[in-house]
Regions:
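Short acidic/glycine-rich loops and adjacent helix/strand connectors
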Residues: 1-98
């Protein structure tokens, strides 16, 4: 059976992450970027904006770390729940765009 390569995208709250994983369970990359505030905690709409703004760089770093390119990817997965709705929608939008 052919080994499959998955790009996993996570963005349920303050962290946006991208990982490349094989169907054998090998984690080839795990890159994350965290939305932070100086005071007051997570502002969901601002966290979602952060996720959209940094998604390309996080995904590119994940590919580089894994020594893979987009043509190597067989499937894309993304976090769906639980989480903050604006962040989940931003993450879904990134996955659909790909």
């Amino acid at each position: 059976m052919k080994e499959l390569i998955c790009l996993g995208i996570e963005g349920t709250a303050h962290t946006f992450g991208a990982s490349i994983i094989t169907s054998k369970g090998d984690i080839l990359s795990d890159v994350r970027d965290m939305y932070t505030t100086k005071k007051g905690g997570i502002i969901p709409q601002d966290a979602a904006k952060h996720h959209k703004e940094i998604s390309n760089s996080v995904i590119e770093k994940s590919f580089k770390e894994a020594n893979k390119n987009f043509d190597d990817i067989n499937l894309i997965s993304f976090s769906r729940a639980p989480g903050l709705a604006p962040c989940l929608l931003a993450t879904k939008d990134v996955a659909i765009r790909l």
